[in-house]
UniProtKB/Swiss-Prot annotation:
InterPro entries documented for this protein: DNA_mismatch_repair_MutH (IPR004230), DNA_rep_MutH/RE_typeII_Sau3AI (IPR011337), DNA_rep_MutH/T2_RE_sf (IPR037057), Restrct_endonuc-II-like (IPR011335)
Subcellular localization(s) per the UniProt record: Cytoplasm
Family according to the record: Belongs to the MutH family.
Coiled coil (UniProt feature): none
The organism of origin for this protein: Citrobacter koseri (strain ATCC BAA-895 / CDC 4225-83 / SGSC4696)
Gene that encodes it: mutH
GO molecular function, one term: DNA binding
Full protein name: DNA mismatch repair protein MutH
Taxonomy of the source species: Bacteria, Pseudomonadati, Pseudomonadota, Gammaproteobacteria, Enterobacterales
GO BP: any one term: DNA modification
SUPFAM superfamilies found in the cross-reference section: Restriction endonuclease-like
Alphabetical UniProt keywords: Cytoplasm, DNA damage, DNA repair, Endonuclease, Hydrolase, Nuclease
């Protein structure tokens, strides 16, 4: 642990970012919180994004919840991913909020989803709920860009979901739509409504939606990387 400290400014290169992330591997969240002068919450019920915030502090992330990537100068997005003892993802991964209006002319190439997933630093974290939060360890990081096949898989799902949004079918979309990318309501409470297009082209109010990567996508991605690593 000697010399291990959070980055006070965004890293100047991918190599520096990855090196810092690799240094965190094996440490518990409690240890990293203490070194950063923070107290780990008992659980994540009221602090759902706490692990991400902790790692943003350690890695010198800049964006917060702004639309650009967490490491805007590098074009890299940070994604923490809770995994079980086998390294399998325990939940879907939030990508970004879905635009429900003003989508004429939008393409996969210029989409927010593709922008966010262009370059991702994945940091697996133990997610087994039987392990106290402070004792959960950080795993080995992975700096990833979608290959041609992954990009095509995501594009097909995105196009299907966006077609439904544009055609006024947002209320008919379920988590089962999309093979690897899904659209789900994203709101802290059911009163937070946003405008969308209805079946007759009229403006309706509905829950905000978010794009999420399904577990089958991230599981394959992590498994391939760590098999290669091994």
């Amino acid at each position: 642990m000697p010399g291990l400290r959070p980055l006070l400014s965004p890293p100047a290169s991918e190599a520096l970012l990855l090196a810092q992330a690799q240094q965190l591997s094996g440490y518990s969240l409690g240890e990293l919180a203490a070194l950063a002068g923070l107290v780990a919450p008992k659980d994540l019920k009221r602090d759902k994004g706490w692990i991400g915030v902790l790692l943003e502090i350690w890695l010198g992330a800049s964006a917060g919840s702004k639309p650009e990537q967490d490491f805007a100068a590098l074009g890299v997005e940070l994604k923490t991913i809770p995994v079980d003892s086998l390294g399998h993802p325990l939940e879907t991964t939030f990508v970004c909020v879905a635009p429900l209006t003003g989508n004429s002319g939008v393409t996969w190439e210029t989409s927010h989803v593709r922008h966010k997933l262009k370059r991702v630093l994945w940091v697996p974290v133990e997610g087994d709920r039987s392990i106290p939060l402070a004792d959960r360890r950080v795993g080995s990081p992975l700096l990833w860009s979608p290959n041609e096949e992954e990009d095509q898989q995501l594009r097909l799902d995105w196009e299907e979901l966006m077609d439904m949004i544009v055609l006024g079918q947002v209320e008919r979309i379920t988590a089962r739509h999309g093979e690897f990318l899904q659209l789900r309501p994203k709101a802290a409470n059911a009163k937070a409504l946003t405008e969308a297009i209805g079946a007759q082209g009229e403006t309706i109010l509905t829950l905000p939606r978010g794009f999420y990567l399904k577990k089958n996508f991230t599981r394959t991605l992590l498994a391939r990387h760590f098999l290669l690593q091994g």
